[in-house]
Amino acid sequence: MKTHRIRLAGPWDSHLVGDDGQPVSEVIRCQLPFTLPETHQESGVLLTRGFHCPTGIDDSTILRIVLQANRSPNAVRVNGIAISECPQRLNAEFSFDITGRIEAFNQLSVLFMATTSECGAVLNTAWLEIRG
């Protein structure tokens, strides 16, 4: 099975979020790697990015979002639908199956909430993995 990766480089949009995970700040454009600033370690961050459906996929194609991060995100959504119910983890890579869940244009959302036991969220890189 052949694997192809499409890097989801910037720009990304970042929003600081409250305890309920809802945005409480204006949108700030950012690039990866993204680190939550020390001044906002008590809150969380919602990172969003749009991407187009890749060409040449069919019913046998497996699609995954892969995030390289210092910890597991609290939530991952594609087009508003949660996909983080069962992430596969290998080292610092978190893989989410999105087969059959994408449209012509898509919105990826990654939520990191603040924790008291860990350092701030760092999202190093992200990509769309195509297996088929």
Locations of the language-model features?
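Cysteine-clustered segments with highest specificity for TGF-beta superfamily mature ligands
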Residues: 105-116
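Short loop/turn positions at the edges of beta-strands in beta-sheet-rich folds
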Residues: 57, 69-70, 90, 102
